[in-house]
Every structure is written in structure tokens, then in C-alpha cells.
From Swiss-Prot:
A GO MF term: structural constituent of ribosome
Signal peptide: none
Coiled coil: none
Cofactors demanded by this protein: Zn(2+)
Record lineage: Archaea, Methanobacteriati, Methanobacteriota, Methanomada group, Methanococci
Gene Ontology CC, one term: ribonucleoprotein complex
Protein name: Large ribosomal subunit protein eL43
Gene Ontology biological process terms from the UniProt entry: translation
Alphabetic keyword roster: Metal-binding, Ribonucleoprotein, Ribosomal protein, RNA-binding, rRNA-binding, Zinc, Zinc-finger
Length: 96
């Protein structure tokens, strides 16, 4: 019998077979897809920002190291804070 490292529906989480339950394997699949996706470097805009470790992202072109989220370079909360800061800066520049 040949063991497959992935399945059609679950993807790479198929390596666990029927263990741990479907819901957990689907969550794992979603995290692994986000984690291994190529992201754009905020320094040079090259689309090869790779995860080096937990919350550490490195650009393959310019070598910039960025601290971000565990599975994505920018978390949802980080995006909200960035937008809020940008709004404050824009409102202050309008006042001057």
C-alpha cells in the first residue's frame, strides 16, 4: 500500500491520515498555505518575503529582516494600527 503525503481536500495535512480530526487538519492546511505563500517585501517590494522562523521574515533579494506575525508578515491587528497611525499623521499634516 502506498502512503500519500497529501490528499485532494486536505492538502499537505493529509500526512496525518485520519488522526486528529478533520477540523484541526483543515485549520492546519489553511495556516500552512498562508505560511508558505510568497509575500511582498515592504523595503524593496520584491515578491519573495519568506518565513525564516516564528515571526521572522527575510527578503530573498535585499536581505531585509522583518518582525511580523507568526504565520503572515503582517497581522490583522497590525494592519488596523498602521491605518490608525496613517490617519493621525494625515490629519496633523492638514492642520499645519
Amino acid at each position: 500500500m502506498v502512503e500519500f503525503s497529501h490528499t485532494k481536500k486536505i492538502g499537505s495535512a493529509g500526512r496525518f491520515g485520519s488522526r486528529y480530526g478533520r477540523k484541526i487538519r483543515v485549520r492546519l492546511r489553511d495556516v500552512e498555505i498562508k505560511q508558505n505563500k510568497d509575500y511582498k517585501c515592504p523595503v524593496c517590494a520584491f515578491p519573495k518575503l519568506k518565513r525564516a522562523g516564528t515571526s521572522i521574515w527575510v527578503c530573498e533579494k535585499c536581505g531585509a529582516k522583518i518582525a511580523g506575525g507568526a504565520y503572515t508578515p503582517e497581522t490583522g491587528a497590525g494592519k488596523v494600527v498602521t491605518k490608525a497611525i496613517r490617519r493621525v499623521i494625515e490629519s496633523k499634516s492638514r492642520e499645519i
